[in-house]
């Protein structure tokens, strides 16, 4: 049940980013609170502190990237809250590599799709990042897919 709730929340954020290039604050907040409640029931205080510290560090780093207009605010928040779930573990490096690979694939798809002259009837049903050359890339999709892929390995989600 806990695993499915995590995957559902992450999938909702990724799908929202894919279709509207927006990740709701409510979704990210629920993910953060969900982690903190679950962690308080199952994890030692030192582990919780290390997870929170790493997530706050990620948020500061992402804020710098956001300020430089390199990433979106929703991507920054989603990345930070997902790092909260991964914590200080070897899994973080795997997560970062997967995000890079999936994000690179999405970027290639976007660049390729933007070269196509889509019929007006089709454009109405497509995400803006596919049809508009100056649109950004919905990196929340890569962040979410990588997290869902690795969810079975996240320590706090494993059955006891």
Whereabouts are the PLM-identified features?
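A membrane-topology feature that recognizes alpha-helical transmembrane segments
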Residues: 1-160
